[in-house]
Each structure stands twice: as C-alpha cells, then as structure tokens.
UniProtKB/Swiss-Prot annotation:
Role this protein plays: Catalyzes the reversible adenylation of nicotinate mononucleotide (NaMN) to nicotinic acid adenine dinucleotide (NaAD).
Pfam families reported for this sequence: CTP_transf_like (PF01467)
Cross-referenced InterPro entries: Cyt_trans-like, NadD/NMNAT, Rossmann-like_a/b/a_fold
Gene giving rise to this polypeptide: nadD
Gene3D superfamilies, A to Z: HUPs (3.40.50.620)
Keywords: ATP-binding, NAD, Nucleotide-binding, Nucleotidyltransferase, Pyridine nucleotide biosynthesis, Transferase
Enzyme Commission number(s) from the entry: 2.7.7.18
Name of the featured protein: Probable nicotinate-nucleotide adenylyltransferase
Amino acid sequence: MMNKKAIVLYGGQFNPIHTAHLLVANEVYHQLKPDKFYFLPSYMAPLKTHDDYLDAKYRIKMIQLAIEELGFGEICQIELERKGQSYTYETLKDIVNNEKDADIYFIIGTDQYKQLDKWYKIEKLKQLITFVIVNRDVNYQEVDESMISVNIPRMDISSSLIRNRVKNKQPINILVPRSIHDYIREEGFYEN
C-alpha cells in the first residue's frame, strides 16, 4: 500500500512574517518531514482585529523572502483569492478536496488551541485534518490524541510588536530576517 503524501499548512496574517514564524515553520518541517509545506496567508482572520492591515501583495512578497531564507515552502493563496473573511473550515475543506491523496496537517499555536471550541464547524474540521499544536509555553502540551504537539523554544515576537516598533522608529533587525527588514524599511510599511 502506498503511503499518502503529507502536506503541512501554516496559516496566518503574516503582517509581517517574522523570526518566530520562521522558527515554527522550521521546527514543524523538520519534525514532520512533509512532502509539501504551504504558508497560507489569510485575507482577514475571523478572531483578529484588522488595524495596520497590509495589502496581500506585500505580505506575499515578505513570505517569499522568508521562504528563500528557510530553503523550503510555497505559498497557498486560496484565502487571498476568496477575499473577505475566511473560515479555516471552508479553506481546508477546499484543500482536502483538491488533495484527496494527502494527509493534511494544520499548524496552530497554543493560544488558538485553547480557542478551538469557538472555531466555525470545528468538529467537522477535526475529521478533515490533523492539527499540529505548536507549544511555546511549557515543555509539554497536553493535546487531544488526534493532534500532534511540537515544542519549540519560546520567542516573544509578534507582528504587532514589529509594527509598533516600526511606528516608534525602533530597530526591528533580528526580529525579522534581513531581507524582510530591508523590504519593510524601503517600502515604508507600518510607519504611521
């Protein structure tokens, strides 16, 4: 019997993508060794606010720079093409239908794991995919047996921290890869 291929999806606003995102991607990629690894930028996430929202084409460019840095990954633009608010269930149902011969893994953080009961059609979603819970808080994360827990070093970096530092004219080097730092500075993103 042939093994199904493994596809990992890493969703987020990536506004901007930063070093902690790269750490998550790298750790999950090397632990699961998937056939494909997709970054899945959201158009608008249902449980987030949308201040300082950078247009998708700029976020895509930064993800491409991050992929060059990592040496793996592709961008799945299904949510961007759909526009409007995206529910993970709808997105992943479409991906599962297009990838019938694959096991789909979806990365979320412990903060999202604790909110899963609020997710749209969560029980149906759990039947479609395997959640990969990335844990930054403790050494071991108790997760449902149908899920995978991946521990990574804690790194207190957020996209909002980076946007605020840019706005306040503080340095962001080290918080984002050099190529993304240069792109943000050249384009003047998040300055006001």
